[in-house]
């Protein structure tokens, strides 16, 4: 894809603007990975958003945890560049990653894995008053929701696809059975930056729904580690390195070992849920999700 002269000129001007404002405050939640690659880190382990500048426009990874985040992300983008947001790539279809789509699309074209649209529409049908409840959270949230409309992906891919935008290449990869019905990892091979979806989260228990299996999670982590990324942005939690994956692998390995030991002692699943302790992870948030983790580990043990 060749850039048009007008876009090249706009890109040069935009880069000069970036250099002049990078010393300014983009907000405490904006962190810089590399030149032109930023992350909006969600508050209190909320979902993250990636901001990638190219010569032909901006690509976002998810749209923020809620519309107040989306508005803050848009404000940061406008400080960084005058170029439009061309694409928004979903790492998953859940509302805490997608409600803010309306802030960016149009003009942004939303891309997700096959099945994301159906998942999003199902949740809208199941929770018809969701937006009304969200607006009641605070006056700021109500203001951020002004103009809300449901925005589903305009493009769905299957298994793998590549998006070339300006000087950057984005490789989209489906992650089977790790979190939702349609999880996507986004890999920038030249920059060695990976947006790893919610296959692994930081300092909190992940919810393991019936569609999720620990072997699928471990397979996805192994694949992503094999890319040898320099920077990793998880779906939730502080961005970092492959240590995020290693910590997650260690946790699931320990969980399976302990569940297996208790199962061999003759304990039922309900007994294991009541008695199992993981003191190494007492500092992790979302402890209400532990039962779903134990159930997933129990399935692994019983399948051996």
Where are these regions (language model features)?
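Active-site metal-binding motif and surrounding structural segment of the metallo-beta-lactamase
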Residues: 30, 55-57, 67-112, 156
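Divalent metal-coordination and catalytic microenvironments
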Residues: 36, 52, 62, 77, ...
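Conserved beta-strand hairpin/beta-sheet module of binuclear metal-dependent hydrolase folds
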Residues: 31-76, 184-198
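Bacterial N-terminal signal peptides
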Residues: 8-18
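Metallo-beta-lactamase
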Residues: 25-27, 32-33, 57-59, 63-67, 118-254, ...
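Accessory terminal helices/loops
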Residues: 24, 226-228, 239-304
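Sec/Tat signal peptide C-region and signal peptidase I cleavage site
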Residues: 19-23
């Amino acid at each position: 894809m060749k850039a048009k002269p007008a876009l090249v000129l706009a890109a040069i001007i935009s880069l000069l603007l970036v250099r002049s404002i990078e010393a300014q405050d983009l907000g405490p939640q904006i962190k810089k990975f590399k030149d032109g690659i930023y992350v909006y880190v969600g508050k209190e382990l909320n979902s993250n958003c990636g901001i990638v500048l190219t010569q032909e426009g901006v690509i976002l990874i998810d749209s923020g945890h809620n519309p107040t985040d989306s508005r803050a992300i848009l404000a940061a983008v406008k400080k960084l560049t005058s170029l439009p947001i061309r694409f928004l790539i979903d790492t998953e279809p859940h509302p805490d990653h997608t409600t803010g789509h309306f802030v960016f699309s149009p003009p942004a074209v939303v891309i997700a894995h096959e099945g994301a649209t159906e998942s999003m529409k199902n949740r809208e049908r199941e929770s018809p008053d969701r937006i009304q409840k969200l607006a009641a959270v605070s006056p700021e949230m109500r203001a951020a929701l002004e103009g809300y409309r449901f925005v589903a992906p305009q493009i769905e891919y299957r298994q793998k696809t590549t998006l070339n935008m300006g000087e950057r290449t984005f490789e989209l990869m489906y992650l089977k059975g790790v979190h939702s019905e349609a999880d996507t990892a986004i890999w920038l091979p030249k920059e060695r930056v990976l947006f790893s979806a919610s296959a692994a989260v930081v300092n909190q228990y992940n919810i393991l729904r019936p569609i999720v299996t620990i072997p699928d999670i471990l397979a996805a982590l192994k694949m992503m580690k094999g890319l040898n990324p320099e920077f990793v942005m998880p779906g939730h939690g502080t961005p970092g390195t492959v240590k995020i994956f290693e910590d997650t692998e260690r946790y699931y390995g320990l969980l399976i070992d302990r569940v297996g030991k208790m199962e061999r002692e003759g304990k039922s699943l309900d007994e294991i849920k009541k008695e199992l302790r993981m003191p190494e992870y007492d500092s992790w948030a979302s402890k209400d999700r532990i039962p779903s983790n134990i159930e997933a580990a129990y399935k692994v043990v019983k399948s051996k």
